[in-house]
Amino acid sequence: MSSERVRGIQVHRPIIFGSHARLLTEAEKQLAPAGHTHKWTVFLNSAASPPLKQGEPPDYEDIDYLPGGADDLSYFIRKVTFKLHETYATPNRVIDKPPYRVSETGWGEFTVQIRIQLIPESSEKPLGLQHNIKLHHWGAPVEPLPVVSGAPTPTPVPTESNTEVKLEPDTPAPLEESVTPAPTIQRPASEPATNEPGSNQGTPAPPGGDSTEQIKVDVATPALEVIEPSATPAPLSLAARLPIHAWQYDEIVFSDPPRQFLDILNAHPPTPLPAKSRRPRDQREDYEARKKGKSAARGASVTASARASRAGTVDTAAAGTPAPAQIGIPGEPGSADVPLEFTQEMLKGEHNAMLDARVKIVEQMDRWRERLIALEKELAKAKEDVKATAAM
């Protein structure tokens, strides 16, 4: 029978899932809801990436590049449901054919629930994954953070009468001075003050004999000239202009698959992973290569390549959009160290890392066992001392 399971067999299919995010262009901001700053894409792909095409610009130079996707996974996946944040219209997005991805705009990070439903021949229940969408870079950036000038410093200037301005902290200022920033008009002493909305008519004259009108005139006299910031916004750092990749590798394992489903899997073997990356390892390596001039044949600089991308985010990115690029724990990988392609080298590295972790766990277990034995001996000796003391 086709539904009979083949015992003692496990078949795996490698996948990668995660998110890609970048700043909105000015044109995209006009179409996006108010307050949205980023465009993001959550995806599920096969682990292997397609090979680079000769005579065409490298795909990783496209600012909307996604890793993986060499294989069509519809031969065993019936549909993928991405459950977004409830504030989005139709938060449950069902994708029933490749590519399995959802693109939206937003301003905040949240966790996406991913539900994978397999074809009926698999006789398997739906699988569940989750991924936290990353909108901001973390860890050490690819270049040093730009020096940000401080807040504008008030520059004192002399008044027209060249007299020293004295501040009276104990003098109650009229209410309209704190509400309405417009300067107060100086009136002659004989002219009565008009009743303005919000004026403090019941305030008694302050000590020293100064009238309220005199205080208004003194406050209205400009004593400080504030240097306004430049109308030209500061340019975004390179780290802010680069996209944010956040993805992880996983394997869908089928144990004792039905005969019919096993035949389907055998008819669609996964594309082998490359031994080494055919693309730059990560954004940091790509930046260093461009900085040293090693990639002149394919584009000269990060800015030039981004201008050639379909999104064009670098040229049209909105200045003033928040672009965090904070330094993380020294030595810890950051967003600039996320690989652009999954390879056998990475697979072996993860395997070796797991072996090293296992060795460290065994070493720690041995140390704790030795300590436990020593403490048990100390406890037994203490009990003997207590018995000897009680017998005396």
Curated annotation (Swiss-Prot):
PROSITE patterns: YEATS (PS51037). Residues 5-268 form the YEATS domain. Residues 357-392 form a coiled coil. GO terms for molecular function: histone binding. It comes from the Eukaryota. It is found in: Cytoplasm; Nucleus. Residues 192-203 have a biased composition (Polar residues). Residues 280-290 have a biased composition (Basic and acidic residues). GO terms for biological process: chromatin remodeling; DNA repair; regulation of transcription by RNA polymerase II. Keywords: Activator, Chromatin regulator, Coiled coil, Cytoplasm, DNA damage, DNA repair, Nucleus, Transcription, Transcription regulation. GO terms for cellular component: cytoplasm; NuA4 histone acetyltransferase complex; nucleus. Residues 146-213, 263-330 are annotated as: Disordered. Residues 296-314 have a biased composition (Low complexity). Component of the SWR1 complex which mediates the ATP-dependent exchange of histone H2A for the H2A variant HZT1 leading to transcriptional regulation of selected genes by chromatin remodeling. Component of the NuA4 histone acetyltransferase complex which is involved in transcriptional activation of selected genes principally by acetylation of nucleosomal histones H4 and H2A. The NuA4 complex is also involved in DNA repair. Yaf9 may also be required for viability in conditions in which the structural integrity of the spindle is compromised. Belongs to the YAF9 family. The coiled-coil domain is required for assembly into the NuA4 complex. Component of the SWR1 chromatin-remodeling complex and of the NuA4 histone acetyltransferase complex. This is Protein AF-9 homolog. It comes from Cryptococcus neoformans var. neoformans serotype D (strain JEC21 / ATCC MYA-565).
